[in-house]
Amino acid sequence: MGLLEEYKNAHIIEKIISNIYLFNRFNSVYLFGSLLLNDRLKISDVDILLVYDLFSNDILDSEKLIRSKLNCLTGYEIDLIILSSSELEELHFLDKLYSKYLKIK
């Protein structure tokens, strides 16, 4: 398991990572929220931040596919936040997570 052994929900994280192809359209992908808590019972959903450089309509298609596929794989609601690289910086989104995120791409 390696880097993921610190997470009690590593089996869910591994399912997401094993389907990394779903995120090909995005430059960066981060997991955050209750999935990363070390409590298997408190997962409310799977929070994923997707970062892109240039917007195009295929982002919307990718969003639907990611949500559907990962919901089936994990059994949890998939909450996606999609930001451009510039929005990510302007909003300081990662700073607001206080390093409680896992970059998977």
List PLM regions with ranges.
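Catalytic core of pol beta-like nucleotidyltransferases
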Residues: M1-Y30, L36-I43, Y52-K105
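Amphipathic, hydrophobic secondary-structure cores in small proteins
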Residues: V46-I48
